[in-house]
Amino acid sequence: MMNINEIKEILPHKYPFLLVDKVEEITESKVVAYKNVTINEPFFQGHFPDYPVMPGVLIVEALAQAGAIALLNKEEFKGKTPFFAGIDKVRFKKQVLPGDTLRLEVEIIKLRGSIGFGKATATVDGKIACSGEIMFAIG
């Protein structure tokens, strides 16, 4: 388990682009993390003022940050910078709204050198909001 201060020590992202609030579980190949979505998120000012919905690309970014935590927790990658290298088969199935808690689960399915591949799923109340495959490069 990691709190926000421990997450900030691992990820280079800072406000307003840090999209992981807590890590519940972390192993060599899997991470389960959470993002508490509030009406105070800066992106809700423009997406959309009368019907606030978390942008899908930011859900994918939150998944990428969770996956990066799993990779950067490995001894050989500590202190390195994670880069989002690609996405595939991403689907959005449920809107994420203010007040939702986004559960972010990423399983690292392959690691070749400094390139990692993960299966990612974001859920709200047990229902899939977004799923897909993500690719990381560690610099």
Swiss-Prot record:
Q: Name one Pfam family in it.
A: FabA
- Lineage of producing organism: Bacteria, Bacillati, Bacillota, Clostridia, Eubacteriales
Q: What is its main location?
A: cytoplasm
Question: Which family would the database say this protein is a member of?
Answer: Belongs to the thioester dehydratase family. FabZ subfamily.
Its annotated compartments are: Cytoplasm
Role of this protein: Involved in unsaturated fatty acids biosynthesis. Catalyzes the dehydration of short chain beta-hydroxyacyl-ACPs and long chain saturated and unsaturated beta-hydroxyacyl-ACPs.
The residues responsible for catalysis, as annotated, are: H47
Name of the protein:
3-hydroxyacyl-[acyl-carrier-protein] dehydratase FabZ
Its gene? fabZ
Q: Known catalysed reaction(s)?
A: a (3R)-hydroxyacyl-[ACP] = a (2E)-enoyl-[ACP] + H2O
Q: Per the UniProt entry, what species is this protein from, by scientific name?
A: Clostridium perfringens (strain 13 / Type A)
Answer yes or no on keyword Transmembrane: no
Q: Name one GO cellular component term.
A: cytoplasm
Superkingdom of this protein's organism: Bacteria
The record's EC number reads 4.2.1.59
Q: Which GO terms describe its molecular function?
A: (3R)-hydroxyacyl-[acyl-carrier-protein] dehydratase activity
List GO BP terms, alphabetically: fatty acid biosynthetic process; lipid A biosynthetic process
Keywords in alphabetical order = Cytoplasm, Lipid A biosynthesis, Lipid biosynthesis, Lipid metabolism, Lyase
